[in-house]
């Protein structure tokens, strides 16, 4: 924790400096590689961690080494992870998917924005200083056409996005030759289908079945295709966004870039303060990962924060505004029904979802059914025209472990399953949001209920937190639950930062939350038996046993922290080649002792073998050549 707290002015200046001086940056001893596909423009980025050779013998003067293979890993950092790419936040990222979108011939450019709010913002000269300078003319599906990845998948079409994803999900493991690295324990997948090699056809089939989604708005061509589904790698979402009391556009762009650097597969912009529209434009134009939002937050701002004044018209305008900016998925709290609200009365913590509480208040004040539920088909029509995926929000999720798995929570979940089928009628991609606060013994039921009642649509959970006693450490309490539910089949985990329940996270909090959740997701992949998931672990274990300290740092999820902790006690360069660390010292290092035992055992075996052969030679009379029948 920093000893001195920066002022708001200093925070903004620091963020501005960050984005002004931003360059493509690789992690230590890593390089960006690209694997090309068969379709035009399919060039999939990965990070390759270079390793040092292993000393296997020889003398001090002429040591003998064995090379260690470079380890390819999944990379979410986009152009920010490639030192060869010039970064200019003012111009935004290259439009990777634009040629693919144009080639399909099913979209048209809009001459006029569909949202009245967008028109008003564009006409306001006072916003010129804040507005993103680049111009993206939004697109929409042509009349009678659907432009969703689900629609294409159901038509049997393998899109470039699907091939891109297949290559990405395989993580370059076909490049690994070492049997030591390829070894993997069998997993327990709880019914998940995990093929040894992920093909573009497998991706298409999973999307067509609704078991996976590709969040890829046609107006966010900068994004690199990724997939969310239980038969793929477990993904992690990071939340950013300003509030009425803190954060600025510069800081949110900084947090976006920072999130992708530390492994965010998607980012949700949960801004509730000023300049939501302008902040989101900057984020989208500079994001290589899908961006999600909760549209009800902005709709509420449009009616001055008064939930009772919300209308379908204001909400619809917000959907159009955000869809034409390029938002890839909407969280919609359409399952908070009027009849479910009384079920929360006996809860210890009531309704803790912001979106859920807004809709519950609206329902009670008007004594009408949730207008998101009533207009759900119209929501689907909008999403189908831009390929916005739906993340059906759990507005009645439990906010304490006492309220876990109650009547209200599962009533809403069953309604989300009904809405899923409606969305699929419009070829709209769907995932389901889940809790929340759930003790460990009650977590698996959440997954089984979701699979049964939501027809295997991908599950996306916030944690869940497994205990309520650790404010300041809720990235730990929730990381435990996240690892478990990821193993049981959850497709994406929404990170929790140390600031959960306490305040708006800063840059360091974002990193802490992401590292915690990348650990949880990876642990789940190992437990499920995802092919190739253990390669990096094996490489780390080999480097650890061989005292290749630099390789240990570089293979870590956070190389900088690993190195810093090591160097606190052994900062000298000699510490990087020492066969011990400060934990045990040179005489008590178990791995050093194990190496000595192994070397001793191997030597003794050889010597014993020579002695046995010598005795056998003498017993046979010392003859160099034996008759055939004696041999």
Curated annotation (Swiss-Prot):
Q: What class of enzyme is it?
A: lyase
Q: Which UniProt keywords apply?
A: 4Fe-4S, Iron, Iron-sulfur, Lyase, Metal-binding, S-adenosyl-L-methionine, Thiamine biosynthesis, Zinc
Sequence positions that bind [4Fe-4S] cluster:
581, 584, 589
Q: Where does Zn(2+) bind?
A: 437, 501
Gene Ontology CC terms, in alphabetical order: cytosol
Q: Name one GO molecular function term.
A: carbon-carbon lyase activity
What does the record give as its pathway? Cofactor biosynthesis; thiamine diphosphate biosynthesis
Q: How is the cofactor bound?
A: Binds 1 [4Fe-4S] cluster per subunit. The cluster is coordinated with 3 cysteines and an exchangeable S-adenosyl-L-methionine.
The cofactor required is: [4Fe-4S] cluster
Q: Which GO terms describe its biological process?
A: thiamine biosynthetic process; thiamine diphosphate biosynthetic process
Which catalysed reactions does the entry list for this protein?
Answer: 5-amino-1-(5-phospho-beta-D-ribosyl)imidazole + S-adenosyl-L-methionine = 4-amino-2-methyl-5-(phosphooxymethyl)pyrimidine + CO + 5'-deoxyadenosine + formate + L-methionine + 3 H(+)
In terms of Pfam families, this protein maps to: ThiC-associated, ThiC_Rad_SAM
The Swiss-Prot or TrEMBL record describes its family as follows: Belongs to the ThiC family.
**What protein am I looking at?**
Phosphomethylpyrimidine synthase
What is the protein's species of origin?
Answer: Escherichia coli O157:H7
Q: What is the lineage of its organism?
A: Bacteria, Pseudomonadati, Pseudomonadota, Gammaproteobacteria, Enterobacterales
